[in-house]
Amino acid sequence: MGLTISSLFSRLFGKKQMRILMVGLDAAGKTTILYKLKLGEIVTTIPTIGFNVETVEYKNICFTVWDVGGQDKIRPLWRHYFQNTQGLIFVVDSNDRERIQEGAEELQKMLQEDELRDAVLLLFANKQDLPNAMAISEMTDKLGLQSLRNRTWYVQATCATQGTGLYEGLDWLSNELSKR
């Protein structure tokens, strides 16, 4: 009985913990997104070698967000962060048409990993403020998202430097993860 009351109390008043992995090709805007969410401001970034990890509190949920570098030489290390990941944020530079296929291949490779089979996928279509940014429908097509079966996914248009779309993405993520 005591356990039931305490678990109910923590559900009503406690913060829910969620482990989120944020990956994507280099220069997609992952670190800018992380610190815009954490600090509410733009920070000067350099290419991430390794990872950044921060706790972002939003709507009574503590998201532990792992921002892992995206250079091709360190992508094989991504798999070391897969364990216990509940949500996967894949960040794509909407303006980078030349590398969208490379992004699609990396995403498909990751989604085949057994440790990520239960993770929900949030795709941040970043840099939507740029004039030649791909539309969401075009990105969905080029990334092959329609072919994903047995996977909950969502594409959110974002602009990390302005903060546009970031919290809408977290809303979707928290709603999906709270169903589990």
UniProtKB/Swiss-Prot annotation:
Phosphoserine modified-residue sites: 147
Record keywords, A-Z: ER-Golgi transport, Golgi apparatus, GTP-binding, Lipoprotein, Membrane, Myristate, Nucleotide-binding, Phosphoprotein, Protein transport, Transport
GO cellular component: cytoplasm; Golgi membrane; plasma membrane
Localization of this protein: Golgi apparatus; Membrane
Annotated lipid attachment (N-myristoyl glycine): 2
GO molecular function terms attached to this record: GTP binding; GTPase activity
NCBIfam families the UniProt entry points to: small_GTP
PANTHER family for this protein: ADP RIBOSYLATION FACTOR-RELATED (PTHR11711)
Name of the protein described by the UniProt record: ADP-ribosylation factor 4
Origin species: Bos taurus
